[in-house]
């Protein structure tokens, strides 16, 4: 998909300053479960293409990952995926209730009442080395509250 876009719209790519991609999982199983109709092989092919184009066109590349019950265990893995594909940042975003999920409270691990909240907090501690303690941190957590 992205290769086709790149070949059809060179002006956009040549003037691109930033590109964000939302990805719901760092594994085939999680990605295809959460992104209905999504294909793990296809997203990886697109990420590889973006990575190569980034080298040539020098735009910022950001991976967005909305953290929830079914993928929070892959927070560290999505950071590694971001590094693999030369992302400038990996944003771990809090899931918000936009009244589109019937089971939001079940998915919302940010709630202290959620049975997996403590495990989420422990996993968040494991990714602290990526959160600005290095010269060039890869991870930003603009909306997550521990």
Show which residues each predicted segment covers:
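Acidic helix N-cap motif at the loop->helix transition within catalytic regions
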Residues: 5
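Radical SAM enzyme [4Fe-4S]-AdoMet core and its adjacent flexible, acidic
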Residues: 8-146
């Amino acid at each position: 998909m992205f290769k086709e876009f790149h070949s059809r719209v060179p002006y956009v790519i040549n003037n691109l300053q930033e590109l964000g991609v939302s990805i719901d999982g760092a594994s085939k199983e999680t990605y295809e479960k959460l992104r209905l109709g999504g294909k793990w092989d296809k997203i990886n092919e697109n990420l590889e293409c973006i990575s190569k184009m980034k080298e040539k066109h020098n735009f910022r590349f950001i991976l967005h990952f909305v953290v929830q019950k079914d993928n929070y265990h892959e927070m560290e893995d999505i950071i590694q995926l971001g590094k693999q594909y030369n992302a400038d940042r990996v944003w771990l975003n809090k899931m918000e209730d936009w009244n589109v999920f019937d089971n939001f409270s079940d998915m919302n691990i940010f709630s202290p009442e959620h049975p997996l909240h403590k495990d989420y907090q422990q996993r968040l501690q494991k990714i602290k080395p990526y959160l600005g303690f290095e010269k060039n941190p890869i991870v930003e957590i603009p909306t997550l509250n521990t």
